[in-house]
């Protein structure tokens, strides 16, 4: 991918959430990206729990939340190297969360920050997963970003997934009504 | 989430992270976490600090005047915006064929639900008249034609009200309502409007762009469009029940020189039962789970969004019970 294409992607305002959704459900990605965000209005207990968790988990840590461009990072840890941290409520979508984190790392690298690793925290299961960003990841991530743009350029969202995970998704009512 | 109704005059203010209603003799503190609407039927003093707090907590404040007429709402700043959906909404308004298609759907849904109210009471002749009118919906060539068709249907519907309720009705009179039944309908419709409005604000739909009603109406007319579908089920049925069970009596109305309005006691009876109606649950056949009546509004908005996206034609909520 050349630098023109990268600029192009920035313009498309791809957020970390969108990267994660790309690996979860293309329909969800499309709806979310078009501003049809149902996360805030769903009474879905999981969604609310996730939000509260996100808002409160690291309050006592003395680290700032750092945000730039479309990226939001829970906190950065300075140990010679910068680490990206993300808090997630369950390991169900681990692959998606890993790519979300790798996207943040990539964005930091683009800014010239020395960062090649991060940690996903799962406080509810008291687990943490280390994520390392490899050169191969960069290529895969570029493919995913292009894939995201392809999904978003479609006039209609993808058909509903029809999978078991739909029942716990904030978009369930919307998709199945 | 709950709805609070304020009937006594006083001051509503923010007190740290709660709301305090200060009356002459007492102070009531309400935790904000579970409020989503506040209806105010009395004189209240309030300040911008309160409104800012309500906006932050996504709470709507609706005002009714002394006579129970709806004055307006404070609605928190839109948190959901979608330029994409807005463009589609406008497109469906500007394209006459698309607008008419949606407008017809609203009327079709309303008439289905109206018919169901009569069907249960075995008004066979009026039901077949409504069927005839419904068949004409598809042939209407303009919004005006559609509106007049709807007016015909409504007249036939309201003609049964004196018999159903045993109360004087005459014809529908709005500003001002000429008798108790009309006052009740106006009040109930205003309540329904606010419920729809709140749900619209939770989606990315723009409440000012409507299809059956003209967007130029001073109100958020999309809420008027959608309320048409729900009024027969949520409001009319409730009115029949309250009268037939003798829960509302002539004494709940004040007869002014020129018009009639619900007294505080009458409003209390109505909103209590209205609230219970909204909280009732029913097994949804498509989603295969129990959902609240009030969620039916949200689901219809989802269907409307899908229609606007071009994904699936909107089919309004048709009462099945
Ligand atoms: S309900 Fe299913 S299809 Fe719809 S967005 Fe969620 S996961 Fe995708």
From Swiss-Prot, chain B:
InterPro entries, sorted: CRISPR-assoc_Cas1, CRISPR-assoc_Cas1_C, CRISPR-assoc_Cas1_HMARI/TNEAP, CRISPR-assoc_Cas1_N
Annotated GO biological process: defense response to virus; maintenance of CRISPR repeat elements
EC nos: 3.1.-.-
Cofactor: Mg(2+); Mn(2+)
GO MF, one annotated term: DNA endonuclease activity
Residues annotated as binding Mn(2+): 150, 213, 228
Annotated CDD domains: Cas1_I-B
Pfam family, one: Cas_Cas1
The UniProt record lists the keyword DNA repair: no
Enzyme superclass (EC): hydrolase
Keyword field: Antiviral defense, DNA-binding, Endonuclease, Hydrolase, Magnesium, Manganese, Metal-binding, Nuclease
Keyword check for Manganese: yes
UniProt record similarity statement: Belongs to the CRISPR-associated endonuclease Cas1 family.
PANTHER family hit by this protein: CRISPR-ASSOCIATED ENDONUCLEASE CAS1
Subunit structure: Homodimer, forms a heterotetramer with a Cas2 homodimer.
Function: CRISPR (clustered regularly interspaced short palindromic repeat), is an adaptive immune system that provides protection against mobile genetic elements (viruses, transposable elements and conjugative plasmids). CRISPR clusters contain spacers, sequences complementary to antecedent mobile elements, and target invading nucleic acids. CRISPR clusters are transcribed and processed into CRISPR RNA (crRNA). Acts as a dsDNA endonuclease. Involved in the integration of spacer DNA into the CRISPR cassette.
Protein name: CRISPR-associated endonuclease Cas1 2
Lineage of the species this protein comes from: Bacteria, Bacillati, Bacillota, Clostridia, Moorellales
